[in-house]
Amino acid sequence: TSAEVPATAQGVTHALEGTQ
């Protein structure tokens, strides 16, 4: 769904931030 796309993108961004 449309709501699933932004949710996944936010999750990836948060994961990348945690890695850095």
Curated annotation (Swiss-Prot):
Cellular compartments annotated: Mitochondrion; Mitochondrion inner membrane
Gene Ontology biological process: ATP biosynthetic process; proton transmembrane transport
Domain of life: Eukaryota
Cellular component, GO annotation: mitochondrial inner membrane; proton-transporting ATP synthase complex
Keyword Transmembrane attached: no
UniProtKB keywords: ATP synthesis, CF(1), Hydrogen ion transport, Ion transport, Membrane, Mitochondrion, Mitochondrion inner membrane, Transport
Stretch list, region Disordered: 1-20
Annotated family: Belongs to the ATPase epsilon chain family.
Assembly and oligomerization: F-type ATPases have 2 components, CF(1) - the catalytic core - and CF(0) - the membrane proton channel. CF(1) has five subunits: alpha(3), beta(3), gamma(1), delta(1), epsilon(1). CF(0) has three main subunits: a, b and c.
Function: Mitochondrial membrane ATP synthase (F(1)F(0) ATP synthase or Complex V) produces ATP from ADP in the presence of a proton gradient across the membrane which is generated by electron transport complexes of the respiratory chain. F-type ATPases consist of two structural domains, F(1) - containing the extramembraneous catalytic core, and F(0) - containing the membrane proton channel, linked together by a central stalk and a peripheral stalk. During catalysis, ATP turnover in the catalytic domain of F(1) is coupled via a rotary mechanism of the central stalk subunits to proton translocation.
Name of the molecule in the record: ATP synthase subunit delta', mitochondrial
Species assigned in the record: Spinacia oleracea (Spinach)
Lineage: Eukaryota, Viridiplantae, Streptophyta, Embryophyta, Tracheophyta
